[in-house]
Amino acid sequence: MRFIPLLAVVAATVIAAWLPQPLNAQSDDVFAFIPAGGRTLLASVVASHPPADEIKALASGKHTRDEWVSYLKDHAKTIPALQSLTDKELLTLADYLSFNMPLPANEMPADAAKLPMDGRDFALEKCEGCHVITVVVTQSRPKEHWLGTMHKPSHIGIKLTEAQREQLASYLVLNAGIPIDQVPEELRAGGASY
């Protein structure tokens, strides 16, 4: 009878090792060279404890990326965490918000890991599953080219909605094109591309 509880503990340990890492673990992983996605940026903004009405406005707003950029810049005094974002991070956050807001029930989840996935998440979950992530993140391509690749027969079977494909392509336009010397040696693909 001891065998079954021991087997359960071993199985739970193996399963836990395969579960997604928490948002704050991104800075500790081998993929830290890949810029933060909007989910991580939004989680850090929320974790800075801005006024409740500002959080509600973020969760319930529906804007284009450019409108979100203006909104975020206009609210940087009341949401101080926005002041520490680079222009690229602000644009990445605005892009994420344009795809994912308003949230259901117009409320920010208490657990930031329950926020919708961002482009970085999709790249690591969907692209890395078939080839080294370097193939993706070292390429600088326009959105139409990313979408063209995602609609090829070799990629169309990837389980992403059309909106998620758009979001992934948009994230890559903003954040890919990482110089190869910034990629850890063990992840270099030797110049591979699509």
What are these regions (language model features)?
Residues 60-61, 139-145:
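Short cysteine/histidine-rich zinc-coordinating motifs and their immediately flanking basic loops
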